[in-house]
Amino acid sequence: MNYLLTALIALLAPISVAYNVPHGFLTGEAVTSHSGPNDLDGELPATDEVKREKRGYFFPSHFQSDSGLLSRSEHPNEYLKKWITHEHNRYRRMVPASDMNMLYWSDELAASAQRHADTCDFRHSRGRINVGENIWAAPYSNYSDAISIWFNEVHNPRCGCNHAYKHCCGHYVQVVWAKTNLVGCGFSRCRDVQGVWGRGHRNVFVCHYNPQGNTVFVTARGQLYAMPAFTWASGDNGKCSNCPANAPACYQGLCYMPKNYEAPTTTTESTTTSTTTEEPTTTCEPDEPEAEGADNNQEEEEENNDGFRMRV
């Protein structure tokens, strides 16, 4: 009798099965694309397709994007352009870099990012030349957490990110890539997003960067070497101590080209010094201080920056 009762209870008891599902599949959270390495021209062997194709190899060759999934294309307005640029620069200030460039908004990069967002495709776009790409998708349309999610990959204890390309922190590396000085982003609402496990992710936010980050190359011994995202600042080589020639000034730890910058140049015919005036060629400079009095206005700028908030 006890045996039959035990068997009956076992049959009626609920069955619990644990599935190994990707992050965000059941939770309705935001997900980010895999970020693969970018090779220096001619450095990686042509047969190394897995490392060069970014994340396209996760899907079959017949998997194509369907622009019919697009519900509405939303180009960032002037306020959002400033907010996106400010957020990137805010996180770039956090790393101890001696050569970190200030980011500026690029309408050209924004247009290419918007084109890919409009495909509602979670895979990385093709045909980019020296342009990095980060992708975010979520069930909700407020993408104010996108840049923080990308940056916080560095804090993943299971990743062990060393500020150079790794599969688990490629988005972070692109955000803090010191040589990058241009960013442009686009956002789209979709009926569905292809390439995301599960359903409900109907919003896509894409950012393009130039120059691109996540660079790797092959050493003389045939080993892959991931270039560090920035030069470490320490001792006498503090922040901005290694600013490039095209961004010689420093503001809150970021290298930038001030307006009406007078670069001294010497001539061989005399001992006098002449000056030339160079203007930045970027399309939007929301975070750039004035050439004069930048240090005096630092506290005021910080107060203004803290006022940026986004609701989409």
UniProtKB/Swiss-Prot annotation:
Domain annotation SCP: ranges: 87-209
Domain of life (superkingdom): Eukaryota
Key word Signal present: yes
Record CDD domains: CAP_euk
Residues annotated as signal peptide: 1-18
Ranges of biased composition (kind: Acidic residues): 285-305
Pfam families for the chain: CAP
Keywords annotated in UniProt: Glycoprotein, Signal
SUPFAM superfamilies in the cross-refs: PR-1-like (SSF55797)
Positions glycosylated per UniProt: N142
Stretches with biased composition (Low complexity): 265-284
Any single Gene Ontology cellular-component annotation: adherens junction
GO BP annotations, alphabetical order: negative regulation of BMP signaling pathway; negative regulation of DNA endoreduplication; negative regulation of multicellular organism growth; positive regulation of growth rate; regulation of mesodermal cell fate specification; reproductive process; sexual reproduction
Disordered, as annotated region: 265-312
Tissue: Expressed in hypodermal tissues.
Job of this protein: Regulates body size morphogenesis, but does not affect male tail development.
Family: Belongs to the CRISP family.
Official protein name in the record: Protein lon-1
Lineage: Eukaryota, Metazoa, Ecdysozoa, Nematoda, Chromadorea
Gene behind the chain: lon-1
